């Protein structure tokens, strides 16, 4: 009987010895929670970037394009030597960086041409509503109002290449479209030469391609745009401010705006950009 009792206690002690202590369990749980909550470098920098945007006078109205670039003190008219038409505006800092990049490209036999620059809310509204109503065909050549009667489906088709008013990076004065509006142009000949130069040198002047190929690294947002380039020294703080302050419910004032919240347009489109454009 005594032998059985001793054997029982030995087994019991062995069981307790194999169990982690309460401190060990708590420590493991704490470590797991810490690991799960560890922010990315970009997320960690968001408060600083957003604060810098606010300190520079940026607001959600600015992000949403509620201003006239022709009357804004931080904007300048693009000289037609560098654009395909009159009346294009960029932020002064962005334009100065572009001019430096233009001259460097020219020395390498590459000619850069601005096709589109700042588009404020009203300008973007005109583009969006023309596509929404079918007055302007979408990229697949269809009349969206007839081909996609469901409002959310129609918005998603237009969003493949065009922004809802209030959500476009073109509102910011930091973004421009160069040379052509098709990816195919940049895949051969002169277009390929331009694109290879830009992917090699644009970062030296502060520029980044926000709409890289969609896939695992960028599952949401607009389709790839090899022509679209963004000036990061200003666009990065504005992106951070958008993440902090811009909400889907603020996206109003145009036909189809009612589906902005269903789609999650801020998270998926305003913030659905190339990760290289989020941190330097």
Identify the role of each PLM range.
Residues 14-17:
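C-terminal motif of bacterial Sec signal peptides marking the signal peptidase cleavage site
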Residues 1-8:
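Bacterial N-terminal signal peptides that target proteins for export
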Residues 19-280:
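Extracytoplasmic cell-surface/polysaccharide-interacting catalytic and binding patches
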């Amino acid at each position: 009987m005594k032998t059985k009792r001793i054997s029982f206690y030995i087994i019991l002690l062995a069981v307790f010895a194999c169990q982690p202590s309460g401190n060990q369990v708590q420590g493991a749980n704490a470590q797991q929670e810490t690991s799960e909550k560890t922010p990315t470098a970009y997320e960690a920098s968001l408060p600083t970037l957003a604060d810098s945007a606010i300190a520079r006078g940026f607001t959600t109205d600015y992000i949403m394009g509620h201003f006239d670039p022709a009357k804004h003190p931080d904007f300048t008219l693009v000289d037609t030597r560098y654009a395909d038409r009159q009346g294009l505006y960029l932020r002064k800092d962005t334009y100065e960086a572009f001019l430096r990049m233009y001259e460097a490209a020219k020395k390498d036999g590459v000619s850069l041409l601005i096709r589109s620059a700042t588009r404020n809310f009203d300008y973007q509204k005109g583009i969006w509503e023309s596509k929404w109503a079918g007055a302007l065909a979408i990229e697949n050549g269809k009349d969206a109002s007839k081909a996609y009667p469901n409002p959310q489906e129609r918005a998603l088709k237009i969003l493949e290449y065009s922004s809802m008013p209030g959500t476009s990076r073109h509102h910011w004065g930091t973004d421009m479209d160069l040379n052509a509006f098709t990816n195919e142009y940049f895949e051969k000949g002169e277009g390929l030469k331009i694109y290879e130069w830009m992917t090699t040198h644009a970062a030296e002047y502060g520029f980044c391609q926000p709409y890289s190929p969609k896939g695992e690294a960028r599952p949401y947002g607009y389709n790839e745009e090899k022509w679209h380039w963004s000036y990061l020294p200003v666009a990065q703080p504005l992106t951070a401010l958008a993440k902090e302050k811009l909400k889907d419910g603020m996206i109003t004032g145009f036909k189809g705006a009612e589906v902005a919240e269903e789609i999650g347009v801020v998270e998926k489109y305003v913030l659905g950009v190339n990760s290289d454009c989020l941190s330097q």
